[in-house]
Amino acid sequence: MATLFIADLHLCVEEPAITAGFLRFLAGEARKADALYILGDLFEAWIGDDDPNPLHRQMAAAIKAVSDSGVPCYFIHGNRDFLLGKRFARESGMTLLPEEKVLELYGRRVLIMHGDTLCTDDAGYQAFRAKVHKPWLQMLFLALPLFVRKRIAARMRANSKEANSSKSLAIMDVNQNAVVSAMEKHQVQWLIHGHTHRPAVHELIANQQPAFRVVLGAWHTEGSMVKVTADDVELIHFPF
């Protein structure tokens, strides 16, 4: 058996091929797993569990079917869907996890996270993240009428796209010191994360021992998952 990890699907109505690919994944590979972990940015945007978007209801039902089949499903918030709440988690049968979680998998201690907190060189983003994660600000935003939230979210996405266009790729990648610090804080030799859309397996030194950082790919033109078994940790790409 295997434990599966995915991230950065950025599901939205404008990308039906990705949605269809994810549904096939849920109906196939996911049903064979010991557990499924979604490490953030499942959706391109999330403005509240009360959004009646049919895509959200469709995804909740599909994930719930996996959970009901006996495969536990877990979710860590990303930078796009950090407002996904308990209502959607309940509807989809997912368990919400903290932003950093250590798993014991087949004899390995594995740290999982979305990955945006590792991009400490991007000071502008980290300042924005700290602001929008303030509970009082989230409560205020979620109390606004839905149409107002949609306008704010669209403007924020446009601003983010414009800001990122002028940033270097290095700034938007993880900071190596932040990676080592996180792994040593949790005393792990394995880290799995998403966010950067740069799939790879990196070797490093943490806790004065060889360590590995596995980065999930985004679901743009193909699927991406990490498959952890007793024998191996594999980064796998597959067609929709």
UniProtKB/Swiss-Prot annotation:
It holds the Pfam family Metallophos. GO terms for biological process: lipid A biosynthetic process. Pathway: Glycolipid biosynthesis; lipid IV(A) biosynthesis; lipid IV(A) from (3R)-3-hydroxytetradecanoyl-[acyl-carrier-protein] and UDP-N-acetyl-alpha-D-glucosamine: step 4/6. SUPFAM superfamilies: Metallo-dependent phosphatases. One of its GO terms (cellular component) is extrinsic component of plasma membrane. It catalyses: UDP-2-N,3-O-bis[(3R)-3-hydroxytetradecanoyl]-alpha-D-glucosamine + H2O = 2-N,3-O-bis[(3R)-3-hydroxytetradecanoyl]-alpha-D-glucosaminyl 1-phosphate + UMP + 2 H(+). InterPro entries: Calcineurin-like_PHP_ApaH (IPR004843), LpxH-like (IPR043461), Metallo-depent_PP-like (IPR029052), UDP-diacylglucosamine_Hdrlase (IPR010138). Binds 2 Mn(2+) ions per subunit in a binuclear metal center. It is an enzyme of class 3 (hydrolase). Keywords: Cell inner membrane, Cell membrane, Hydrolase, Lipid A biosynthesis, Lipid biosynthesis, Lipid metabolism, Manganese, Membrane, Metal-binding. It comes from the Bacteria. Its cofactor is Mn(2+). Its main location: membrane. Mn(2+) 1 binds at residues 8, 10, 41, 197. GO terms for molecular function: manganese ion binding; UDP-2,3-diacylglucosamine hydrolase activity. It is a peripheral membrane protein. Its EC number is 3.6.1.54. PANTHER family: UDP-2,3-DIACYLGLUCOSAMINE HYDROLASE, UDP-2,3-DIACYLGLUCOSAMINE HYDROLASE-RELATED. Hydrolyzes the pyrophosphate bond of UDP-2,3-diacylglucosamine to yield 2,3-diacylglucosamine 1-phosphate (lipid X) and UMP by catalyzing the attack of water at the alpha-P atom. Involved in the biosynthesis of lipid A, a phosphorylated glycolipid that anchors the lipopolysaccharide to the outer membrane of the cell. Belongs to the LpxH family. This is UDP-2,3-diacylglucosamine hydrolase. It comes from Escherichia coli O139:H28 (strain E24377A / ETEC).
